[in-house]
């Protein structure tokens, strides 16, 4: 099996993939109104940023990008935990997880 193409993947390929993932996540945030899908879209956007950090880190030969990924992953885990806890408590209270439902709840 010829695996030479793996060695030819450059920085541009990683950045294009990260941009596509980010756009997909942004589309999910802008177009969907479900809280769970919204959180998953934000996680996808954060993972595309992680891919960019790792790609630049590999390209420049530094470990700074890899270290930054750990911080982003920590923040993403905390964001997911808090977001899911809020979604569960909102669902228990209102039996609804649609964002449009909560626009009238300004206090």
Swiss-Prot record:
One of its GO terms (biological process) is ATP synthesis coupled electron transport. Its EC number is 7.1.1.-. One of its GO terms (molecular function) is quinone binding. GO terms for cellular component: NADH dehydrogenase complex; plasma membrane. The keyword Transferase does not apply. InterPro entries: NADH_UbQ_OxRdtase_chain4L/K (IPR001133), NUOK/Mnh_C1-like (IPR039428). It catalyses: a quinone + NADH + 5 H(+)(in) = a quinol + NAD(+) + 4 H(+)(out). Gene3D superfamilies: 1.10.287.3510. It holds the Pfam family Oxidored_q2. Its main location: membrane. The chain crosses the membrane at residues 11-31, 36-56, 67-87. It is found in: Cell inner membrane. Keywords: Cell inner membrane, Cell membrane, Membrane, NAD, Quinone, Translocase, Transmembrane, Transmembrane helix, Transport, Ubiquinone. HAMAP family: NDH1_NuoK (MF_01456). NDH-1 shuttles electrons from NADH, via FMN and iron-sulfur (Fe-S) centers, to quinones in the respiratory chain. The immediate electron acceptor for the enzyme in this species is believed to be ubiquinone. Couples the redox reaction to proton translocation (for every two electrons transferred, four hydrogen ions are translocated across the cytoplasmic membrane), and thus conserves the redox energy in a proton gradient. Belongs to the complex I subunit 4L family. NDH-1 is composed of 14 different subunits. Subunits NuoA, H, J, K, L, M, N constitute the membrane sector of the complex. This is NADH-quinone oxidoreductase subunit K. It comes from Bdellovibrio bacteriovorus (strain ATCC 15356 / DSM 50701 / NCIMB 9529 / HD100).
């Amino acid at each position: 099996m010829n695996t030479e193409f793996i060695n030819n993947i450059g920085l541009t390929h990683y950045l294009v993939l990260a941009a596509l993932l980010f756009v997909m996540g942004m589309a999910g945030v802008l177009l969907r109104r479900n809280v769970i899908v919204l959180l998953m879209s934000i996680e996808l956007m954060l993972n595309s940023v992680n891919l960019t950090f790792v790609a630049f880190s590999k390209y420049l030969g530094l470990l700074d990008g890899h270290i930054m990924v750990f911080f982003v992953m920590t923040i993403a885990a905390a964001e997911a935990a808090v977001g899911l806890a809020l979604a569960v408590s909102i669902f228990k209270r209102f039996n609804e997880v649609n964002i449009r439902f909560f626009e009238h709840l300004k206090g």
